[in-house]
């Protein structure tokens, strides 16, 4: 999913008019755009697919291509834009994140399998959210950037589409 101010998400709506943006919490200053296959397909139809990224010697490619990265760079001009991804099943899985600021990649795509057991503040999603201005509200797992931003209330992109507040960009 993409995370950023409305201005950074607006270019995606120009490519895919059906793209939907949501606020996860009341008074949010950052918003999310769940990346569906339709959005990826439209972006890749307009600009080419590019290469799928494989990060950190992993055997798993990210749901991110070189085309996605170039477009995110352009979309972040004048603001910041993050890309975050989680893939968990039965409590185990991976998370990934990247950030662009003012058109430049400021946090390269990072993938972390749970087996690496890095402290929560150093995991890619929390690091990306922190770079976007989200501050953890306390200590412990339930008060990290992920929880503060409101992601803990949703188990999937489908939950966000069903339950979060849709906003106009």
Spans of features found by a protein language model:
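Short, extreme N-terminal segment that most often corresponds to the first beta-strand
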Residues: 1-25, 166-169
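Compositionally biased, intrinsically disordered low-complexity regions enriched in proline and serine
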Residues: 13, 23, 48, 147-150, ...
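Long, compositionally biased intrinsically disordered terminal regions
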Residues: 102, 106-169
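Short, intrinsically disordered low-complexity segments
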Residues: 18-95, 99-101, 105-106, 111, ...
